[in-house]
Amino acid sequence: MPTHQGQEFKKTCSPHFYPLSNMAKFNDIQLLRTTFLRGPSVWTYRPVLEVWLDLGELEDYPSNKIPGLNDRLTAWLPDLIEHTCGVGERGGFIQRLEGGTWMGHVLEHVIIELLNLAGMPAEFGQTREISKRGVYRMVFRCPEEAVARVALEHGHKLLMAAINDEPFEIKPAIHAIKTAINDRYLGPSTGCIVDAAGERRIPHIRLNDGNLVQLGYGAAQRRIWTAESDQTSAIAEGIAQDKDFTKRLLAACGVPVPEGQIVATPEEAWEVAQDIGFPVTVKPSDGNHARGVTLELYQEADIKTAFALAQPEGSDVIVERFIDGTEHRLLVVGGKVVAATKGETVSVYGNGTATLRELVAVLNLDPRRGPEQEYPLDWINLDAGAVKLELNRQHVTPDSVIPQGQAVLLQRNGNMAIDCLDDVHPDVAYYAVLAAKIVGLDIAGMDMILKDVSQPMQGQGAILEVNAGPGLLMHLKPTSGAPRPVGMAIADHLFPREDGPGAGRIPVVGIVGTRNNAFISRLVGWLLQLSGKLTGVASSEGMYLANRQTQKTNTANWAGAHRLLTNRLAQAAVIQTTARSILEEGLAYDRCLVGVVTDMDGFEQLADHDVLEAGQMRRVMRTQIDVVLDGGAGVLNADLPEVADLAELCDGEVVLYSTEAANEFIAAHRANTEVQHEGGRAVFVKGNQVVLATGAQERVLGTLDALSLAGGKRPDTPALLAAIATAWALDITPDLIGAGIKTFEYQA
């Protein structure tokens, strides 16, 4: 299956072109159909948006026949020079533009470049002409449909403006795509975990429009929501949210924490501060992200003001002893410290002419500063209560002109974005892990105050807070130091490496074709169930779980398979699909353990997809074999040469089946010792017997008469062989296969 960007656009230029002099503007390229393919498809393994384009009169005007087109495109999108296209070298696409390529191909590259500029590299696109002149199928990779459609809209507008020599504003287009990305994409914490799981070939399913994600399939799945997992208990999270109770719990277990007390009024805050001793910290009891926290307070007025700042951020307000030192955030995952950062105060320095407001405006231009979920450093807001309090303590206002060299402190806490993992003393790590265990969190962010993180904890630091669902961005994009692979640490915690390469996966069997595939699906599901796995089946005859029908309508589609793969009870899944579903939706799974192709019938029903002859079905049906895992198997009908020829595409083993023992494909496969030392595996009928063969070795499973279903019902022979071959590919024993067939009660 092709996966590279901008595969060569194969079309030769027509010799007939019309002059452009005195010609009216070109009509818009028509977008006839848009289809989001959510899984592996005829194009690639990942989601793509497929667009049918009608070029209209532009069919007669490739890129080298429209004066100024290429100059306008490269002026708006200068990085098109980086697109290699089918040429395979930098500038390849520019060569195609200059030599003449059609507008569907140009639109593909325009959209890819807009996505690149918006911060989401697309990396893949293709354009192919269909049987109708001037109509093309164009696809580009994008994991989110809403983002893809926005990119298509603006790419279309940009191209038409370039064609017709009209103005176009590139910045608003990029901004619109960025907005769609921010609205639809996973947050940085969730995203880095999903990406890490992907590196280990663990599949994921997004369960809502937010950050709730399933990693893995069926019973092997785990769920995450930002940096929380399904191992994060509600009780532990509730404890962590109650800062005062957390401190008391930690103190009872010998963990150093600052002395403090919940207060109800500003007056009580002042009284408690006097009892504890100055300086003090005032903060909300259940806040986060350092909101409402004010440090190192001495004065009554400041303490009462700090109370007012903390109160809206939590249910209660805490006054606690201020501990001198530097703020640190240690990330604990599965009983290990996997990342650590420290903070620093934020100050600006006067130049004798600029106001504080002007100095802060310059500070906020730092590209590392921005909205807290996207950037390691926050913007400084002079209207924020904590900042105002700091300025009041220094007797300056936003409009004060700051003398040359004078420092103005703006922020004492937050923005712990300087990596320091390599400096963490084992004793400090011990207390961080201990605190996480006491609270009961598998993933926790420890806010600690330390004079020196490289020294033992006692006497020079304390744990301030234990945070559930900690932000990970500070560890992914520290302002100084090395980024840490925190996403992989969490993925490894959820799916231990010792689980092997199949972590997160259940046996998935994918079956495509038209010949009794519902029967095959259900019989394979029954045999898997007998082998000890609670098995789900999604077929055209409904959905089954543990051989119990849970849905009567057709589930041989993306939606049915998706429901099955999200079911936490399913220890194995058998999924029937169709050529139409592959063309209109894509497969619902990224890979399967066994892929079965029974036939390539049905092109007559696919004319609306420009499938007009039998030979075109190979491109569709190969999708099922393309997704077979390298440790899996492809099961192919050797009675049909066009199906047997798919064997060359399979990354795993191939098991053939045939109604004839003398089948030439079977004979060649059994003799092939390059793939398997003993020779290939095959299932066939010899006389009246069903034979399982590995190379020259043969085992009789039983006669066709003996392999009847419960009640003596005789199944269709090719369908029976397909099911037997699939079960055998799943390493179900021949004895169990034979016994299971005889006990299978089938009613369509």
Task: Kindly give the residue locations of the regions a language model identified.
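Walker A (P-loop) phosphate-binding motif
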Residues: 498-549
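Flexible active-site lid/hinge loop adjacent to a nucleotide/diphosphate
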Residues: 544-672, 703-710
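Extended, charge-rich helix/loop segments that form flexible
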Residues: 359-416
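Conserved N-proximal alpha/beta basic substrate-recognition cap immediately N-terminal to
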Residues: 19-20, 133-135, 139-275, 288
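Short acidic-glycine loop/turn motifs at beta-strand connectors
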Residues: 217, 332-336, 412, 452, ...
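Adenine nucleotide phosphate-binding catalytic loops in nucleotide-utilizing enzymes
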Residues: 610-618, 632, 652-748
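Active-site nucleotide/adenylate-binding loops and adjacent lid/helix of ATP-dependent enzymes
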Residues: 21-24, 67, 198, 222-380, ...
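ATP-dependent carboxylate activation and anion-phosphoryl transfer catalytic cores
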Residues: 15-199, 336-339, 344-358, 406-512
